[in-house]
A protein has these predicted regions:
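Active-site rim beta-loop-alpha module in soluble metabolic enzymes
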Residues: 112-177
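C-terminal helical cap(s) of enzyme catalytic domains, especially alpha/beta-barrels
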Residues: 106-112, 152-158, 204-222
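Catalytic cores of alpha/beta
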Residues: 122-134, 178-199
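Conserved, mostly hydrophobic/aromatic
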Residues: 11, 44, 81, 141, ...
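Glycine-rich beta-to-alpha transition loops that act as phosphate-gripper elements at the mouths
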Residues: 63-66, 70-72, 99-101, 119-124, ...
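Glycine/small-residue-rich loop that forms an oxyanion/phosphate-binding "nest" at active or ligand-binding sites
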Residues: 56-110
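Conserved N-terminal beta1-alpha1 strand-loop-helix module at the mouth
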Residues: 1-76, 125-134, 206
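Glycine-rich phosphate-binding active-site loops on the catalytic face of alpha/beta enzymes
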Residues: 87-98, 138-151, 194-214
Length: 222
């Protein structure tokens, strides 16, 4: 997937659910077309099929469970999500933590299915551990900064830079994304200057008065 990349995690905000999820996805598609920057939607499972049907942007699941087809009530089945239209998935977000063995299993299955994996981490050490599993992306997000409006790229730049360096030592092909508190063009530029290949963000865009305007500002300095 071409860098720089912006992944918008829709989480479970009402502002990014149902009809508003589609509107947000169309804003991502429009800004991607105008800027030439890869924009990815990570909507709730219920909205994936419609967004895939009505837009041409990449779609990631917010989570996939390490289950096979069968009796797994309430689980997110990879095969069903692919059928609905995903191109990849987030894994181990701070709001949906996973065991290391489960992360490894899902990453292996994403490779078999040829979809992209993004493992979320919270510091340099866990980023290094994630890199040994060979996902396509590691997204570092100190949990105390998530939703805070304080960007990690400026509050704790050493975490971003240290993660980039450590991950590249393990596997140069893995790209690092910067998350937590990202909202503006200055935030994204700071992340890129520290070696990140893009950003993972949510509330800074979703809860803004005009998400498309906020997205345009986000990529304005790249």
């Amino acid at each position: 997937m071409k860098a720089p990349i912006v992944i918008l995690n829709f989480k479970t905000y009402l502002e990014s659910s149902g009809e508003k999820a589609l509107e947000l996805s169309k804003a991502l598609e429009s800004v991607s077309y105008e800027s030439g920057i890869t924009m990815v939607a990570a909507p709730q499972t219920t909205d994936i099929f419609r967004i895939n049907d009505e837009t041409n942007i990449p779609i990631f699941a917010q989570h996939i469970d390490p289950v096979s087809p069968g009796g797994n009530t309430g689980s997110n089945l990879m095969e069903a999500l692919i059928e609905s239209g995903i191109n990849g998935t987030l894994l181990n977000h701070s709001e949906q933590r996973m065991r290391l063995a489960d992360i490894a299993e899902v990453i292996q299955r994403t490779k078999e299915q040829k979809i992209t994996s993004v493992v979320c981490t919270n510091n340099i050490e866990t980023s290094a551990a994630a890199a040994t599993l060979n996902p396509e992306f590691v997204a570092v997000e100190p949990p105390e900064l998530i939703g805070s409006g304080i960007p990690v790229s400026q509050a704790e730049p050493e975490i971003v830079e240290g993660t980039v360096n450590k991950v590249k030592e393990i596997n140069k092909k893995i790209k690092v994304l910067c998350g937590a508190g990202i909202a503006t063009g200055d935030d994204m530029k700071a992340a890129m200057d520290l070696g990140a290949s893009g950003v993972l963000l949510a509330s800074g865009i979703i809860l803004s008065k005009n998400p498309k305007t906020a997205l345009l500002d986000l990529v304005s300095k790249i």
